Amino acid sequence: MKKPCGTPASHPFLLSWVQAQAAVLGLAALAAAAAAGAMESVPKSFEIKQVTRQEAPKIDGRLDDASWQKAAVIDDFKQLQQIEHADITEKMVVYVMHDEDMLYVGARLYDSSPDLITANILRQGERMNNEDKFAVILDTFNDKRNGYRFEVNPNGIRDDALYLDTTQLQWDWEGLYYAKASRDGEGWTAEMAIPFKTLSFDPAGTTWGINFQRLIARKNERDGWVYRNRNQNPSSSGEVTGFTGMEQGLGLDVVPSVSFRQNKDHVNDTDEFKVEPSLDVYYKVTPGLNASLTFNTDFSATEVDNRQVNLSRFSLFFPEKRGLFLRESDIFEFGRLKGGDNTGNISSTFSRSTLENGRPFFSRRIGLSGSGDPVDLVAGAKVSGRIGGFNVGALAIRQDEQLTVDARNLFVARAVANVLSQSSLGLIATSGDPRSNLDNTVVGADFKYTNNTFAGGRMLEGEAWVQKSDTEGLTGDDAAWGFRMRSPNNTGWYGGLGLKHLEENFNPALGYVNRRGVNDQTLELGYTKRRPGRAVQALRSGIDIQQFNGIDSGDLESRTITWRALEAFSPLSDQLKLFYIKSTEVLEQPFQISNGIFVPVDRYDWDEVQLQLEGSASRKLSGGVTLSTGDFYTGDRWKAGGDFVWKMSPHFWLTGAYEYNGVKLPEGDFIVRLMSTRFDVMFNATWSWVTLIQYDNVSNSIAAHSRVRWIPEAGREMFIVFNHNLAEELPNGGFRSQRADATVKFNYTFRF
């Protein structure tokens, strides 16, 4: 095995800028051509009915209030999955009305076999991908770009999300709304009350985008009102007209909270008790523009990260989970450099860390040290929302001092102009480095193109972006740019092509970057065959290619070719996947892959076969298995993993996961194990208790996280949180306590 050689080449920032602008112009030209040939879907609309506050229904899930007789009625639904455009198998009727304060949505969801309704989830905010559920999609500005999604299941459990654009959802957003449901011999009914104070909208606008969806889990059937290419999102919605007289009050939410925390450090034998008050204030400057202030911000009740195994040379990505940064987070997204949830289109096999690489702003950099320990936030302010045809956002944070880093002022600003029918052109700027005392700024521009009516209803999306950082002590080679075009359709052909150029000194101190000095090139191509009514409902095959070349040398550094040989899906979404993966890594310096084991400098090519089996999560007992074997650097690797979820009842779930990597190299053999167990106890729809225990043999440590949550109603919460960390230090292989903490936290939303 020999290292490839190459000829050095220079790529100054001017050339980067010209190349990026050429990509922008190319995307714009393609956008114009696609828009000219696009087919519009058949529009649907209805006029909303208004009632008075005195007539407002009681939200109990029963649909028995007289005011529902005055509501607009929608009953013309079709399947978007299993069989697109087919008649729905179970009748569905939706009722919509509003008063001065709330939008009310009711649904009568008939079911010929009510005993078979899938309703296993009894914890607020839990994802309901495999539950019977009813969902409402709102595009309050009717601009076909962004929106809200509100869901409820037959147990009255709520879940909600923001549409960052028409292809990506932010499920960690939490909006304040009310929902209840009830079951009877004809199926189930649901009621929602969505406060206008929760939504951003134009008070002069009388027309919103709206859509409805139902999932019948046991049939894997999705029914909807308006849809395109088997999908529903703000760009493929109907319209509701006649909004008048909505009131948002003062538009002021005041959320005081207090936490009582006991910390025990067993290593240093210290004990500390803290009382931490905090305050969050949210104010609607206009119905479309929100301002917020935070003082002595407290993240003590945030869920812990799931541990991950890393056998690569580059850092992993952990998503944001803190509510302060999730509210209106869509405003700050840049260039679709986000590898999270999408709306059901084809996902590539590229790792999330490479998809996120190059983000100018990643809020997880704030309030956390490089080792992941919390850093206090003294105060913060944010303005975000929509002004005319612009989306704007600004965030300022005062972060407290930590070890050798002084207290820091951190700032990010974002402005996005809506262009074409579904596209946007934006700017971003950041200032400050939360993890050093060096000055740092980043400026960038991006163009995002979206067309979901391309070629008769196909999806076409693209983006082009450019950034430049300025870091104290670094000069030159500090730019980044990229572009990508994708047609992520879930039926027929799909494909994509992209390039990221990340120079050696590009340093977004408030962003995320785990690999620099490279050109990251991606290609994806495949085909999905739908077979309605068959035991194997869909078949897919394709190829994903990702290659990294050094910018200066042009030499190959890494390449992964994944042949998606076979992907088969049952009507209930059971999945079988067979992949053949060919990898190349070029090491220019020894790589410590495990404690005391170094892979020497050389070029390495290896092959791997991977089999994945996954059972439908709609069953009470579900899970998956992943098996792979093949070469690995100078030796070979056997990898096995599995997970299961046992929903014994809506009140008790047991979850387990195990991952094993057995690596044999001439330089040394090693095994990496990662295990986790989770217990979910749902006493009812307001009380839950979740315990997560994780272990890995790299850190040789166990972490236990237990959280009791009480939500008597939306906007009121109590948490009781226990954390305990143990390390394998005793001579007999036993574990010794490292640290433990207990927290009780209360918060209450006062809405004016």
Predicted regions, residues:
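A cross-taxa feature marking solvent-exposed loop/turn segments within ectodomains of secreted
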Residues: 41, 129, 143-145, 203, ...
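Membrane-spanning beta-strand positions in outer-membrane beta-barrel proteins
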Residues: 104, 189, 201, 253, ...
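Bacterial N-terminal signal peptides
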Residues: 17-33
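Exposed, low-structure sequence patches enriched in small/polar residues
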Residues: 376, 453, 457-459, 464-752
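Structural preference for beta-rich elements and adjacent junctions enriched in aromatics
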Residues: 36-418, 426-427, 437
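Catalytic-domain carbohydrate-binding cleft regions of carbohydrate-active enzymes
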Residues: 270, 280, 290, 299-306, ...
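N-terminal secretory signal peptides that target proteins for export/translocation
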Residues: 1-17
